[in-house]
Structures are given as C-alpha cells and as structure tokens.
UniProtKB/Swiss-Prot annotation:
Entry protein name: Taste receptor type 2 member 9
Predominant location: membrane
GO BP: any one term: detection of chemical stimulus involved in sensory perception of bitter taste
The protein's role, per its UniProt record: Gustducin-coupled receptor implicated in the perception of bitter compounds in the oral cavity and the gastrointestinal tract. Signals through PLCB2 and the calcium-regulated cation channel TRPM5.
Keyword annotations: G-protein coupled receptor, Glycoprotein, Membrane, Receptor, Sensory transduction, Taste, Transducer, Transmembrane, Transmembrane helix
Expression across tissues: Expressed in subsets of taste receptor cells of the tongue and palate epithelium and exclusively in gustducin-positive cells.
PROSITE patterns: G_PROTEIN_RECEP_F1_2
Segments on the Extracellular face: 1-9, 73-86, 147-180, 258-261
Membrane topology: Multi-pass membrane protein
Note: Several bitter taste receptors are expressed in a single taste receptor cell.
Cited Pfam families: TAS2R
A GO CC term assigned to this protein in UniProt: plasma membrane
Subcellular location: Membrane
Length: 312
C-alpha cells in the first residue's frame, strides 16, 4: 500500500505523463496527417516530429523508472533493468535536447539577417544543413547512450574497506552515478548552441530595428515580428532547461543523497514538466498546429454540449 507521499507522486506523474504524451502525440499526428495529404513534408515538420517522438520516449522512461522504483523495488534493483532504463533515458534525454537546439538553429537560419559569407551560405543550403545537423544529433545521442565497459569507472572509485552496509551500497553506486553524470554533461553543448542562437537572433533584431528606424518605414513589420517570435521561443526553452538540467543532475546522483527515493520522486515531477509544457508552447507558436488545436477544442466543446443531459 503506497504512502500518502507516494500516492500524491503517482497522481501528479500520471497527470503530467498524460498531458505530455498527448501534447507531443498531437504534434506528431497533425504533421503526419498533413504530410500524407500534401505528399510532402517541410523541414520544420521533420524537426518537430523528431522532437516530439524523442520527448514521448523520455516521458515514458522517466515515468516507468519512477513506477518501478516505487511499486517494484526488488525488480528495480535488477542491474539489467537499470542498465536498459539508463540507456533509453540517456538517449531520449540527449536526443530531445539536441533536436530542440536544431529548432533554435532553424529559427536562426530562417529569420536572422547577418552579413557574413558563411552565414549566407548556410541560409542558401538550409535544408541540407539542417538535415545533416538532425542526423548528427541522432548519431551523437545514440553513441552517448551506448553501454560502455564500467571497469574504468569502478577502478576510479575503488574502496578497500567497506564495513558499513549502507555506505557499501552507496559506494557501489558511485561508479555508475559518476558515469551517468559525466555522460549527461554532454547536454551542455545543445544548451550552448541555443544560447548562441539566441544572441545572434537578438543581434539581428537590433540591427534590423536600426535599419527600420533609419529608413522610417515603421517598426512592427513582418521581419521584426518573426524575430520576436523566434527569440521568445528560444528564451522559453532556455528558461525551462535552466530548471530541468540541475534537477536532472540531482536525480542522477540520488543514490548518493540521503532520502534518495524522495529526491527521485520530486525530481521526476519537476523534470516531466519540461517536455510536457514545452510541447504546448510549440503548438501555440506554430500556425498550423495552433489552428488544428483550436479546431479540436471547438469540436470537443460542441461534443460536450450535445452530450449535456436535458434538464426540464
């Protein structure tokens, strides 16, 4: 019988999981239906589909990890199961963040106006460049998540005297924990790429605004609006990642922290917010997805009105 804290955890994580999978599944479904209708798919749709699928995987593995830890602690201790969860978690986490950085780079290349030959060449070859970056992101995430030989990590943290049983358990967790922490430091690279994209977009906006004022053609033109939307999208991602990443690192090292189970439960709840909430931000920021979402809401509203029981 789960305790009150565990019951609250199950309710919250189940709610977040439902919202997150629904939101990301909606992105995949709408873009795939549009792809089948038009027999063609745009670059932004490929990026959004890749990002949504990776986040569905991430949400599922985070939730399964929490449920196994809570409901089947004996099974959770199985080294094979833990290894599988770690591999899938590392791959889904890294691919999600790398694909988000791809989205930031796409905004930069599509919207920004920077007078540099290399940047101009990237804009001309945007489809090939972005597909190459997407493929590279997938391969990097796959390579990082491949299980490695743990001998090196165990030699780094070898302890000769382990008299206390609790400490012995914690020491046995150090190599795997340190390995996971080291591997997850790789997500700083997509974060830095998003940061660079943000500053370049900001630079392009400032430069564009000066040109508009110089020629006195108005301020709120389509290019300025596009800059503002892209900057807002990147800022929201950066803010969510600033919250997500430290919590994720704490979760990874939960075996070394007192009350590690409670830390892991709180961490699960916080980390699931990132892939769940960001999906709806992407929906509202994309005209096609936003239109489909509003149509669906109108349909649900009409359906509920028809199902409303008649009261004489």
């Amino acid at each position: 019988m789960p305790s009150a804290i565990e019951a609250i955890y199950i309710i919250l994580i189940a709610g977040e999981l439902t919202i997150g999978i629904w939101g990301n599944g909606f992105i995949v479904l709408v873009n795939c239906i549009d792809w089948l209708k038009r027999r063609d798919i745009s670059l932004i749709d490929i990026i959004l589909i890749s990002l949504a699928i990776s986040r569905i995987c991430l949400l599922c593995v985070i939730s399964l990890d929490g449920f196994f830890m809570l409901l089947f602690p004996g099974t959770y201790g199985n080294s094979v199961l833990v290894s599988i969860v770690n591999v899938v978690w590392t791959f889904a986490n890294n691919s999600s963040l790398w694909f988000t950085s791809c989205l930031s780079i796409f905004y930069l290349l599509k919207i920004a106006n920077i007078s540099h030959p290399f940047f101009f060449w990237l804009k001309l070859k945007i489809n090939k460049v972005m597909l190459a970056i997407l493929l590279g992101s997938f391969l990097i995430s796959l390579i990082i998540s491949v299980p490695k030989n743990d001998d090196m990590w165990y030699h780094l943290f070898k302890v000769s005297h382990e008299e206390n049983i609790t400490w012995k358990f914690k020491v046995s967790k150090i190599p795997g924990t340190f390995k996971q922490l080291t591997l997850n430091l790789g997500v700083m690279v997509p974060f830095i790429l998003c940061l660079i994209s943000f500053f370049l977009l900001l630079f392009s906006l400032v430069r564009h605004t000066k040109q508009i004022r110089l020629h006195a053609t108005g301020f709120r033109d389509p290019s300025t609006e596009a800059h503002m939307r892209a900057i807002k999208a990147v800022i929201i991602f950066l803010l969510l990642l600033i919250v997500y990443y430290p919590v994720f690192l704490v979760m990874t090292s939960s075996a070394l922290i007192p009350q590690g189970k409670l830390v892991l439960m709180i961490g699960d709840i916080v980390t699931v917010i990132f892939p769940s909430s960001h999906s709806f931000i992407l929906i509202m920021g994309n005209s096609k997805l936003r239109e489909a979402f509003l149509k669906m809401l109108r349909f649900v509203k009409c359906f509920l009105r028809r199902r409303k029981p008649f009261v004489p």
